[in-house]
Every structure is written in C-alpha cells, then in structure tokens.
C-alpha cells in the first residue's frame, strides 16, 4: 500500500494538506519525537545494531539483521572457567587512557573558536514576523519641493515639511486627520495650500487602482469631494496635482478632467474615452504591465501650460474573461482586453493639449519608417515647455527611434536610433535635459569588448546651424549605469547610479560633463553596511537624500553634495534593526561559478547556527524574467528567510545567462531558446552546492514564480551526473507554461513574432519537459482570477501531468488576482509553500526489508 499511497495524481491541497512543521533538527538529519513514538518495536538484535548504524550518511537510521549460527548458540551453552584478570595492568591502562582523553579534551577546548552563545537566546524568524510591525520597513517617501525643503511622512503618519539648512520642521497634516479620512494615499499641492487624499482604494492591476478623492486645505480644512460636474461621489481612476499652484487633473471613465485651481469647476478636456476599450491618460493592461510599467500615461509640461497624454485603443484586441466562482449562484466573468502572442495589439497615439484658453488637441506624428508599421510608445519626457521627447519601439522590439516633438506643430525630429539583432532592453528610461533642451543625456548599450555591450551615458548636443547632433560617451567599462538621476548645469556634473563596484551593488556617482569626464563615488563607504542605494537631489543639487536599501536594514539620510557630509538621519528603522538583532537571521555568502565563458554570481543563505558537520536540505530559487537580477545586496526578509531560520534549509540563487547587469552578450544568450541555457546554469549551481559535505544530496528542491515558475518546472525533471533524479520535489507559483498563451509584448520580445516562425514557441513548451517527471513531489499554486498569467497555463500543464502519471498537487486561490493584495492570503500562501518544502525535506524512517516485503505482499 505504501507505494500506492506515495503515488497520487490530482490531489488538491487545502490549508490542512501539510503536516505541522518539524523542528529544524529534524531537517538536519535527527529523528523527531513523533517518529520515535510511532516507530515499530524492533527485536533485541535490531535494537542493538540500530544505535551503532545511526551515524551513517545523511544521519538516517539503517537497520541490519545478523543470522545467528548453531555454533554461536553452542558457545553460549558450554561453560568454561573465567580467566584470571591482571587488575594492576588494567588500572594502569585506564589511567593512561584518562590522561590522554584529558589532553585531547583540553586541546579541543583551547583550539575551538568560542561559540556564539547568544544565538541560542535568539528567536527564529516566523511567518508572523514577515507581517509584524517590528519587521515593517518605514519608507518616509521623501520628496524635494525646492532647493532646501522636502516633504515626508513620519512613522506615526503625520506629513512633515523640513528645511535642510535650518533643520526646522512644520507639520502639514496630522496623522490623526489622515486616519479619520481613512486615506490610503496623499499628495500636497505645489503651493503647499491643499492636500489631496484617496480612500476606499481598490486595486485594478499591478499599479492601477480606483478610489474616492477629497481635497482639504492645509492644515485643518474640511474635506471636499473631487468629482466631475455631471456626477457626485464618483469613483475616480486617477487624480493628481500639476507642477504649478493648485492645478490638477483627474480621470473618470477614461476621460480627462482639468481644474485650474481648487474651487473652480473642473472641465472635461478629453472626452473620447470608452470604459475598458479606449484609455486616455491611463495605461491598458499591456502598457501597464509590460511597456510603461506604470498606470500613468500622461505627462505635464514643466510650466503647467500643456499636457501630453496617450490614447490607447483596445477595440481590436481579443477579450479575455476572468471567472468569479464565489458570491453568486452562477459564476460570473470579468472581460478585459489581453493581447497574446501573435494576436492584435492595442494601437497608441500621443497627443498634446493646451490648458490655457480654448482646448486644442494636437497629435504627435510617429516616425515615417516601414519598420514602425506597428509600434509601442515606451517613453515620454518633456524637454522644455514646447518640446517633448518620445521613444518609439517597433513591435518586434529590435528597432527604437528617439524623437524630439514640437508640441505646437506635432512634428517629430529623430535624435537617435538603436537596433539589435536580439531585442532592445531598458527602453522606458527617461533622458535628462539641460534647461534649454539643446543637450540631453541618455543611457544606451555601448560595446565594451568580449562581454558585449554595457549600458552607459551618452550626451547628445545640438549644434547651431546644423541638423546633426554631436554624440559623446560620458562613461565606459564592464559595468552598467542603472539610472541617470539629475544634471547640474552650474557645476557641469551628472549624477547617476551604477554597478561599477559589483553587479550586485548600486552606488551613487558623479561625473564631469566636460574635459576628462572624471567620476567620483559619493556613496562608497559613506554609510555603514550600505552598498545598495538610491538617491534624490534638491532642486539646485546642493543636497541629496540617500536611501540605503541593503545589505543592512534600510535607512534614509540627508547629505551635503559638496563634501558628502551627513546632515541628519531621516529614518533609521530602529525597531527593525532591533528585531533583526533578536532573530537568528541567515548568513549570506556570495560565490562565482564558471560556466563556459561566463563567471556567474551565486547567493547562498545558510542558517545562523550553520556547522560543516551537519547535513542540510537545499532549495534552489529561480526567479525573474530575462534582464532581471536575483543576486543582489538588497535587504530582504521573505518566506525563504523563514525556511532557512526556522527549518534549517540552505537556499541558493544564481544569476545565469539571460540575467541583467552583466553585459548584453550574456543577456541575449537566451534569445529564442528560453529555459534551455537557464537550466544548464542553474544545474551547475546545484552541482556546485552538492559538492559541499554539508548538503544532503537526498533533499534538494526547486521553486519559482511567474517566469521563475516556468524555469522551476523546466528544471525539475533534470538528471544528475549519474542520470539519477537531482530534485526531490519542486514548486511553481503562477507558472507560465506556454508562451503563445502569454502577453504579446513579453513573448515576442524573446521568441520573435508568433506566426512567422513558431519553432521557438513549440520548443519552449513545458509539455515536452513534464513527461520526464517521475516520482518527484510537485506543488502548483495558482489564483483562478490571475489577470497576468491566466489559470489556463496551469490547466494546460495539469493535462500533461495527468498523461504522464506525474506526482503533483494543486493549490488554488479562488477569485484571487496575480498579486495577492490581501495580507491573510499572503500568509496562507507562505505557510503553504514552507509547509510543502518542510514535508519534502522530512527524513522518513526506513522500515526493515522484511517489513517492506510484507507490505508488498499485502498489496
């Protein structure tokens, strides 16, 4: 019966599907009390042998049976005279042994490093910790509003205006008022007279939401509802201030409304919207998720006199229907436009309207280029009050054109063109302009030798009386500029973030924009335990806010730009630091592995009580889409932390071919063969770990979500060096299983246009891989209302698993979206994943052979 019980197909797990987590010592190879109590009694000989055999490989018990011969029994029955004992010799021998043992013990004590006894007093990280206030990182969301002032939100909830030079603080909004309004978000008007609050906010997709908005005079004014003239108590899709005074816009039913100042009636300036079909100033699903990476698709001119907005038309895009199973007798569906690989894409156009005087709508003209028959708009940025920069990307995503458009005529002039044999990466990043708009800085891929291209800063300068621009590189090297922050014309300096130190780090640099282009690291060794940063500058660049994101607990400090002097700490997250100090946090190590011509980074998480003599289970986590990064020095406390701290597992991550920030050669290796090279690199990482004596080779697992779920499922059947199973179990959360079922912009970027050559799509199907699954435990988790990766992917996968008689479990979340916005659902999700791996890593008692044979005979 045991073999039949172990092999099941189609079991749907609930919260009770996983047993109570065993102690960490059980995962390390010890036997838990439950197993001791439940084990079958053994005969005298088996009991005598078992303790001697318990120290075998992996710490698992072995059982031996020894047949007794007739001679043995005769020896026991025949009596004999006992020999005379030499008591003096025995005493001397015992004394010598005692002295030797004492010397050995003394040597061990003297030579062994002192153990951190404080670890035993520290708690282990739990799932509850992930959601507790003690572990909640507070981001003050500081925003510069002048040369010397910024606005931020303190931990208690109040909104503060702070002057850097005088160090004076003014409370703009009391935290109690925000609580009374049940506000989720706030925004202060540029003149600091009014605040805009949103409440009853409901998420739509990853970034978008709907909600009710009110305006309130600072500091104690009564709230007044923000509504279109024709509707009261309206639920808006967006509301936000402009760059000057009290001007604001809001979007209702995909139409744009403008209000010159608070108290004046709003007017509808764009009225072509159609709910769910034609979007004005907002992204549809595809643009929000894959192109702009934001729900906002409108952009104010610097002086507030004009507004650029995108019109996205989904009328020709096929409809996808998300079912809702609960809450009604009959299931209902929510339709929305979702373009899959090869299907019709949304069309997009860019418009500019004047906000002073009669509304005049002007469309910006796309490039007249046959390669741009179908295109995306990936970036919009105002250069001056009348010039707007636009990046146009063809559907194949291998040709982009950066233009500068005249907002008064709609004519666009090409400023730069880029082309790739694979795909173009980082196409939604904004350039930084000089005040007159004649000079701008942007990031592009520049050849740097054998490792391919790296992303560096280029300056483009317009020449008087010439149609040609002067192009010059500001930075170079085998590292990437990750973001241009700002340009200081007065000092001829450019400020940016880069990976020059290490790919897994981010530091703040400045570079001269004239002469030698000399650069300087501003954040290196500036703050302790801070190697991964982001930053923002005051309007005149005299001061900057430095946000340390790791490896230590995140902090925010304010510095003088000239001498980097720390002026004060804005947020130290002291309660998180204390909570971390009181917990057994994982030890983090970094290594590199050599795969063909590449040196790939690995990150290893070990238990705080790690010792080389124990045996630990191993979990490989594969995550992130091509161009992303899993190995970094950012601070994180996740469910993986719980698995390491509370359950004694070792977790490993590896940035293999296809990952970002290591050159375009490595990035583009995966083109048209997703999964193939990633499997090789991730398996090399596993093989490297299996060479370590402290890794239990019989307890190895893999996990991934989204694209990582595709990879984890792809990797799970992989064989080891002896053609045996490498992985004991694996799990995939919301896996992509067939790229022709996924978003057009994503699939076509890496596999080419579907319909022209479908071989890459067929080769990357998971159906070809899961047939090789044998007895590994496989947990699939998916929300039924997942708007990003439809449950259809999992349904197709399960069909193949059933055909292959695979050993799988399915856990669904009815009517839940992709991003699990509910805290309760996230807790349940994390417990389910942890519980699955704890059970997978449990060391089962090996029954004696005779007992096993009896079970088989009973079957």
Swiss-Prot record:
Gene Ontology BP annotations: establishment of localization in cell; neuronal action potential; positive regulation of potassium ion transmembrane transport; positive regulation of potassium ion transport; positive regulation of protein localization to plasma membrane; potassium ion transmembrane transport; protein localization to plasma membrane; proteolysis
Expression across tissues: Detected in brain cortex, hippocampus, thalamus and cerebellum granule cells (at protein level). Isoform DPPX-S is expressed in brain and some peripheral tissues including kidney, ovary, and testis; in contrast isoform DPPX-L is expressed almost exclusively in brain.
Highest taxon listed in the record's lineage: Eukaryota
Subcellular locations according to the entry: Cell membrane
Cytoplasmic-side positions: 1-89
Membrane topology type: Single-pass type II membrane protein
One Pfam family named in its UniProt record: DPPIV_N
PANTHER family according to UniProt: DIPEPTIDYL AMINOPEPTIDASE-LIKE PROTEIN 6, PROTEASE FAMILY S9B,C DIPEPTIDYL-PEPTIDASE IV-RELATED
Protein name (record): A-type potassium channel modulatory protein DPP6
Upper taxonomic lineage: Eukaryota, Metazoa, Chordata, Craniata, Vertebrata
């Amino acid at each position: 019966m045991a073999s039949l019980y172990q092999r099941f197909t189609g079991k749907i797990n609930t919260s009770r599907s996983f047993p109570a987590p065993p102690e960490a010592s059980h995962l390390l190879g010890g036997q838990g009390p439950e197993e001791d109590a439940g084990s079958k009694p053994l005969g005298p000989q088996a009991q005598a042998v078992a303790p001697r055999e318990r120290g075998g490989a992996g710490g698992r018990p072995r059982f031996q049976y020894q047949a007794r011969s007739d001679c043995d029994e005769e020896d026991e029955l025949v009596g004999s005279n006992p020999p005379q004992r030499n008591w003096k010799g025995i005493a001397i021998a015992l004394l010598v042994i005692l002295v030797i043992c004492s010397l050995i013990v003394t040597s061990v004590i003297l030579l062994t490093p002192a153990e951190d006894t404080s670890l035993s007093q520290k708690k282990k990280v739990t799932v509850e910790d992930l959601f507790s206030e003690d572990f909640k990182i507070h981001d003050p969301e500081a925003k510069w509003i002048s040369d010397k002032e910024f606005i931020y939100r303190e931990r208690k909830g109040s909104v503060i205006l702070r002057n850097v030079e005088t160090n004076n603080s003014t409370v703009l909004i009391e935290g109690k008022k925000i609580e009374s309004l049940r506000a989720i978000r706030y925004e202060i008007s540029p003149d600091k007279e009014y605040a805009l609050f949103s409440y009853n906010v409901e998420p739509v997709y990853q970034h978008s939401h709907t909600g009710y908005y009110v305006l309130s005079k600072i500091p104690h004014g009564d709230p007044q509802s923000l509504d279109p003239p024709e509707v009261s108590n309206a639920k808006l899709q967006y509301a936000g201030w402009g760059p000057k005074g009290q001007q604001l816009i809001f979007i209702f039913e995909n139409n744009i409304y403008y209000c010159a100042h608070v108290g004046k009636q709003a007017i509808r300036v764009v009225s072509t919207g159609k709910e769910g079909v034609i979007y004005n100033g907002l992204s549809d699903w595809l643009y929000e998720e894959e192109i702009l990476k934001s729900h906002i698709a409108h952009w104010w001119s610097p002086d507030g006199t004009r507004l650029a907005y995108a019109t996205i038309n989904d009328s020709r895009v096929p409809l996808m229907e998300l079912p809702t199973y609960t809450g009604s007798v009959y299931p209902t569906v929510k339709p929305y436009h979702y373009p899959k690989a090869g299907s019709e894409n949304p069309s997009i156009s860019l418009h500019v309207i004047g906000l002073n005087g009669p509304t005049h709508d002007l469309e910006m003209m796309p490039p007249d280029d046959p390669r741009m028959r179908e295109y995306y708009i990936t970036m919009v940025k105002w250069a001056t009050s009348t010039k707007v920069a636009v990046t146009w990307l063809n559907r194949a995503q291998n040709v982009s054109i950066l233009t500068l458009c005249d907002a008064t005529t709609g004519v666009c002039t090409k400023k730069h063109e880029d082309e790739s044999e694979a795909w173009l990466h980082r196409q939604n990043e904004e350039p930084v302009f000089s005040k007159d708009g004649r000079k701008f800085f942007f990031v592009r891929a520049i050849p740097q030798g054998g490792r391919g291209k790296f992303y560096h800063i280029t300056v483009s300068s317009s020449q008087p009386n010439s149609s040609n621009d002067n192009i010059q590189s500001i930075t170079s090297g085998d590292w990437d500029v990750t973001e241009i922050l700002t340009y200081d014309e007065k000092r001829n300096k450019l400020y940016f973030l880069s990976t020059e130190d290490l790919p897994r780090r981010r530091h703040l640099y400045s570079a001269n924009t004239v002469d030698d282009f000399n650069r300087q690291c501003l954040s290196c060794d500036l703050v302790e335990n801070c190697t991964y940063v982001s930053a923002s500058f005051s309007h005149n660049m005299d001061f900057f806010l430095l946000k340390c994101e790791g490896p230590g607990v995140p902090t925010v400090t304010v510095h003088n730009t000239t001498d980097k002097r720390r002026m004060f700490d804005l947020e130290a997250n002291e309660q998180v630091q204390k909570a971390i100090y009181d917990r057994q946090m994982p030890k983090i190590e970094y290594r590199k592995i050599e795969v063909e011509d590449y040196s790939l980074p690995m990150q290893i998480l070990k238990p705080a009580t790690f010792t080389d003599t124990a045996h630990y289970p191993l979990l490989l986590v594969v995550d992130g889409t091509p161009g992303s990064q899993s190995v970094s020095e950012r601070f994180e406390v996740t469910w993986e932390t719980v698995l390491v701290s509370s359950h004694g597992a070792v977790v490993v991550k590896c940035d293999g071919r296809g990952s970002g920030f290591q050159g375009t050669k490595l990035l583009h290796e995966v083109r048209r063969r997703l999964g193939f090279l990633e499997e090789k690199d991730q398996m090399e990482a596993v093989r490297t770990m299996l060479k370590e004596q402290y890794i239990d080779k019989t307890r190895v697992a893999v996990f991934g979500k989204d694209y990582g779920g595709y990879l984890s499922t792809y990797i799970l059947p992989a064989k080891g060096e002896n053609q045996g199973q490498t992985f004991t179990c694996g799990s995939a959360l919301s896996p992509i299983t067939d790229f022709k079922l996924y978003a057009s912009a994503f699939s076509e970027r890496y596999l080419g246009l579907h319909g022209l050559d479908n071989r890459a799509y067929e080769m990357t199907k998971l159906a070809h891989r899961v047939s090789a699954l044998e007895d590994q435990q496989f947990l699939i988790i998916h929300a039924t209302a997942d708007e990003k990766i439809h449950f259809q992917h999992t349904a197709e996968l399960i069909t193949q698993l059933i055909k292959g008689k695979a050993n799988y479990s399915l856990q669904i979340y009815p009517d839940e979206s992709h991003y699990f916005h509910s805290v309760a659902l996230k807790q349940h999700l994390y417990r389910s994943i942890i519980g699955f791996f704890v059970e997978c890593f449990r060391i089962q008692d090996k029954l004696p052979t005779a007992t096993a044979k009896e079970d088989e005979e009973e079957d």
